[in-house]
UniProtKB/Swiss-Prot annotation:
The gene is srg-1. It is a multi-pass membrane protein. It comes from Caenorhabditis elegans. It is found in: Membrane. It comes from the Eukaryota. Belongs to the nematode receptor-like protein srg family. GO terms for cellular component: membrane. The keyword Transmembrane helix applies. InterPro entries: 7TM_GPCR_serpentine_rcpt_Srg (IPR000609), Nematode_SR-like (IPR051119). This is Serpentine receptor class gamma-1. The chain crosses the membrane at residues 25-45, 59-79, 118-138, 148-168, 197-217, 238-258, 268-288. Its main location: membrane.
Length: 288
């Protein structure tokens, strides 16, 4: 689809100090770049070097799916999303060549939003897997061995029920801090991506809270009846639940600020949402 030039900005925002914005980029790259390298190493170990060992444990299949998704999202941030936002010096060049970016944006933005949705689904599955380990220790291995491929396939297809509206819509460029941000101009009025994401995020929060609470209660009663290795994985999923809830809390606060039209605070909260998404992208690997 072509760039929507009517909705897109035609000039750069000069209200931000370029060097300050560059510093923001540098600070974010300081944790994003090592995280990308670390994620690539983990993916190599689990998917290739010791694949025979990890393939037997269905939990690590879910973990690998989360790592691969996070790795792609982190690289999107490093090589495109963040430089576009925090390098105001490139703003004029991008706007001058905006038409040449149409094909790239048609591929990048739907993929970016698809991966965000898929990651949330995988993280729901992540917590559900650990909860089932505690609740049904005798049968959970057989269940996940039988159904995991089908569940992951369903989860991989599910975001497409929403992504199509982004894929067919015009993309547009708007101001983001001193730089630019990619959005889309909705072509089908009733197909609202914000509604889909709200439902997905709400489902995620409810599932994570219920599963984690149930798991903690059950673990406190099981004592030594659960293997120490499984117990550690369960505690790891508790820590991950906190990481997964952070973006939900930040997004809710951001929504309230926009609804109240307190736009002077929206920039800070938008930055907080971005950081919380970074935490979600990389936390599972560091915790594990």
């Amino acid at each position: 689809m072509p760039i929507n030039e009517t909705a897109s900005v035609t000039n750069c925002d000069t209200n931000f100090e370029p060097l300050i914005e560059n510093l923001k980029l540098f600070l974010q790259l300081c944790y994003l770049t090592p995280s990308a390298l670390f994620l690539s190493r983990v993916i190599y170990i689990t998917a290739w070097k010791y694949r025979k060992k990890f393939r037997k444990q269905r939990f690590y299949t879910i973990f690998l799916a989360d790592c691969v998704t996070g790795f792609i999202l982190v690289n999107f941030s490093i090589f495109f999303t963040r430089p576009l936002i925090y390098v105001p010096q490139a703003c004029e060049f991008v706007l001058e060549h905006i038409k040449k970016l149409a094909l790239f944006l048609d591929i990048y933005y739907p993929c970016f939003r698809y991966l965000q949705a898929f990651q949330i689904l995988v993280q729901i599955l992540f917590v559900a897997n650990r909860a089932s380990c505690v609740l049904w220790p005798l049968s959970y291995s057989l269940f996940w061995k039988k159904w995991l491929k089908s569940i992951l396939t369903t989860m991989a297809i599910s975001p497409c029920l929403w992504i199509w509206t982004i894929a067919i819509s015009d993309k547009m460029i708007v101001h983001g801090y001193g730089g630019l941000v990619v959005l889309y101009y909705r072509y089908v009025s009733w197909a609202r991506s914000t509604l889909f994401f709200s439902i997905l995020r709400l489902t995620s929060v409810i599932t994570i809270v219920v599963a984690t609470t149930t798991m903690l209660i059950k673990m406190s009663r099981m004592k030594k009846r659960i293997r120490e290795s499984e117990r550690r994985l369960c505690w790891a999923s508790v820590y991950l639940s906190v990481c997964y809830l952070l973006p939900a809390i930040a997004e809710f606060e951001y929504f309230l600020v926009l609804k109240a039209k307190l736009f002077e605070n929206s920039g800070i909260l938008h930055g907080l949402v971005v950081i919380c998404w970074d935490i979600q992208n990389i936390c599972s690997t560091y915790v594990m």
